[in-house]
């Protein structure tokens, strides 16, 4: 059952996307607060972009998809307790990368990408407000 408009909050998908897409300065401030650094300018790439690679494969729908300072950002509202956010983030990253680079382009053209989940719960149960995951290079022996 859907909520009436006046009952929607920032965490409802419709309102989350509506507020962040119609208020670019607020969206930029939210990114800066989460990332802990200034962003000069943002540019929306699309609203609730769906990326489907095959007709029978699992696609993704990006809530707030934007670019700023030569980086790409996807901001997702996560209201349910079902997580597996690390694998979901990895999947989103791959799908976004497939969508960002043209056939024959050099891999150096891939932009740095941030997948941000705004959660109503603590997905990793370590009592933290922000969790940061980065791909890192491990040395070989």
PLM region spans:
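Elongated, amphipathic alpha-helical interaction scaffolds
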Residues: 1-141
């Amino acid at each position: 059952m859907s909520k009436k408009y006046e009952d929607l909050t920032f965490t409802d998908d419709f309102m989350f996307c509506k507020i962040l897409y119609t208020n670019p300065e607020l969206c930029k401030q939210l990114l800066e607060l989460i990332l802990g650094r200034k962003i000069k300018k943002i540019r929306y790439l699309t609203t609730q972009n769906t990326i489907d690679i095959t007709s029978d494969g699992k696609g993704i729908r990006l809530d707030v998809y934007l670019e700023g300072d030569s980086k790409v950002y996807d901001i997702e509202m996560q209201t349910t307790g079902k997580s597996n956010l690390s694998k979901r983030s990895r999947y989103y990253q791959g799908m976004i990368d497939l969508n960002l680079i043209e056939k024959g382009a050099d891999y150096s053209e891939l932009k740095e990408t941030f997948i941000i989940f705004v959660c109503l719960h603590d997905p990793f149960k370590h009592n933290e407000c922000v969790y940061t995951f980065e791909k890192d290079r491990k040395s070989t022996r």
